[in-house]
């Protein structure tokens, strides 16, 4: 231990302050000197600016030391032992956050402690001599923080100061410390302290003092902080950085320089005198309510202060892991300056920061190679930046310094940093400050720092120590920009439009293996750096409001708020605005681009979706906005409009009321945008109105035409009645007499048709009317004559299947019994005026199963017949000449019947088997007609026995035209499409050998005779508009109530598999169902026979459409049944209900 006598102590004291007679007794406090003289061992005292070299020493006990730099402040954790105990033994005095009395900030050559606590002497910094009787002036605004590597005067040290030297020259890395013991266990016992020494201490040292940490509550029994989740610590750290400190009590205190501090012992009074203190004292947060207070500190060492004194080192801020998230942490100490609510107050215009180049930020990893959460990082500009309303930017004077405070919260204990080359071990952390140009961010602006002698030197990065789970506060002061911005001069008292700006960048970087990696960085708003006095630029009367170039006008540069001090637009008014004129908006086409016409239909839809409501504003909002709360309003809701028209709604940030209530993300509506939507909607309504007017005009014209036609009909009826009741001489009288009574009517009609009545004479009109009446009378007489002639012709000729059957000319007798399978008929070949003779076979169903007579009808088509009496042939040939299809001579079937299909039921259908017969002609020209021999074979499809089924949900699609019988479909108003399919196969044919079905008339009971029988009123083939009427009925009782059989001729050129549609109409709603499809011949094509019918569905309504197909047979028959609504059934049991059967027999004309 170095022994210093009293004389040398006095010499050191006075040399350190250079007073030389300038000191007065009232300005000197010699209490510290007197205490040193009176005490035997004053090893716990620390003198400023000791000129003689001293040996290094380290404190190995658990008591924290006084911070060596005013800018780095740490708070020791409560209950967890001393702060250095978390990271092993304390580092030597050159520690980056030094725990001794020097202020070398890691830049002094302080080596590690040697064994025994001694080491080489540290060279003192030479002091600049001062003139006798004078004191050095304080630097500008001496209340600022002076935290930067202390400027060393040695040239070789100045040349070698780099971030690398900061890491290795200053302090040994804290990453090399052993892991700390658990917080709930006491730290290792402190070893005996080595002999202390007093290194060099700078004169003008300004430090910020923190109050002593109070005794906090002890941890709960058995509660281990390491077992708690890591995210709670992260939330606490983030809460610390964002903590609003408005509720903390503040007490203003006077700023004092270190040279004015009275010498005293190292207690709280002496520390408050030596250390510069910001306005407001530090207040600890209240204790946790569930903790019982107990002393958290370990046994005090030799240098530990008493219970009422202040520790020499206020350690870093630590968030207790046991503290629940969201509540104030008992381990946090906040000063009312840095964490006060002044920075959060929107009225306080402080410079804002935002992250800078986040894509270049590196990631930290712990010793287990696990990625650590992102550290919390916040930057505050405490001093030096003033907001200029005229320039709308922050202004910094180059000769005045600024100050920056950084809060860094480290989550976890980092050991490695992730680089493009992989993980690298960390050496140290440091802060780097520099400026950039707004127009060129790659151009860097150097930052300078003023010294105590008012000299400026380049600012070097600041080495910081970041313990885990703590927040470190670093304050860097007395900073200056090395240059000013360009174009600072005003033009005519207004801001220069070519003004250039700087931005300040504060970055936290990590050093690893001679490389620097950015961990976090923030960049400030635009800054104007001026070299002149701000009084030359700022003027409260000229800059804010001044006269403009136009007479009687006032100019203001910036935003204007009326009844509000936070305008976010050019003009914000809280209250009503009365405008006697108009509001103008720019609308010149020359100032617009991408002009596109809108769809007014969509605008009408959007307007129709908007909801108008009546409402009143809440009283707290009305008071803040300056409007009346009781006045009812009508308008829209912004949230609803945002869903319909997002561009009409804008977010204006948080709305704070006078009572403190806040509406986050307050929404406002652009009513001008909604007005334009209304314009488009009105245009669309105009279009609809024009269309309606056009249609109304058309309807009016049609109504006028119908009125004219009705008047003409009335005139015609009057003329025809006069023609039939009077003689020819009375026609003129009937036409002239009413003329005298109708001049106004004729005049009104002529005025509507012809504008000039003089152009048409009265005599011309009379003649025209008489001529019309005569022509009408002649037409009526002609129509009557033709009708009488047609009735007589129909009596002579009987219409059968589109041709006339001449019963008197052809012999239809000789129907004698023949063997089963054929019949014989003779027809004379006479020279009548008939065309091609056609032999057809029309079976007559009887009740006898064994004997089935056949009727051979000789039908001819007249070469010349009366108009309207000819039967139309179904001819659907699209190309001429049409090839003859399915007209080959019929083949003789084998005597044995075919095999029955699997779906065949022989008890349902019986097709007649005609008996073989011969056809003899007359004596002159008698020809034996060919006999068709069909033995017990009748091809057909039947659904007899299949009951009524409900509607199926899954309907099969229609078959392709290649299928012989595509899906049948009946169309009605309330009937779905129905279908049945099947590609014909030879083996799938169904044979009908049972007795014939009895008709409904035979099976009905007497009680049903009085009930109305459902029937069809009209039948038509839609494809060629061919109506099927009674002309297609066969002679006899083929068409009678309850059973209608139509014989429809098909031309030989009609292609096979042609799909047609039967349109069946009824006067009342009925049900129609397809019961069977039959044919008695062999098919014309192999493999073209339809399969068995599936279950059919009836169609209901008054209009029914059923698809049918021209099959590959010469003859085939469709059987439909019409019944009451919902009672259609093809089974024999359904015959007791009123029903009507319709048979459509198609046959080819192959002559």
Swiss-Prot record:
EC nos: 3.4.-.-
Annotated segments matching region Disordered: 55-150, 170-200, 284-339, 722-750, 897-925
Tissue localization of expression: Expressed in lung, ARPE-19 cell line, brainstem, uterus and, to a lesser extent, in basal ganglion and liver. Weakly expressed in cerebellum and retina.
DNA-binding region range list: 250-541
Effect of mutating residue 688 to A: Does not affect autocatalytic cleavage
Span of domain Peptidase S74: 587-696
Coiled-coil regions listed in the entry: 680-711
Disease note: Encephalitis/encephalopathy, mild, with reversible myelin vacuolization: An autosomal dominant disease characterized by episodes of acute encephalitis associated with impaired consciousness, delirious behavior, seizures, and reversible splenial lesions observed on diffusion magnetic resonance imaging. Most patients completely recover and there are no neurologic sequelae. MMERV occurs in children and is frequently associated with a trigger, such as a febrile illness.
Protein name: Myelin regulatory factor
Protein's gene: MYRF
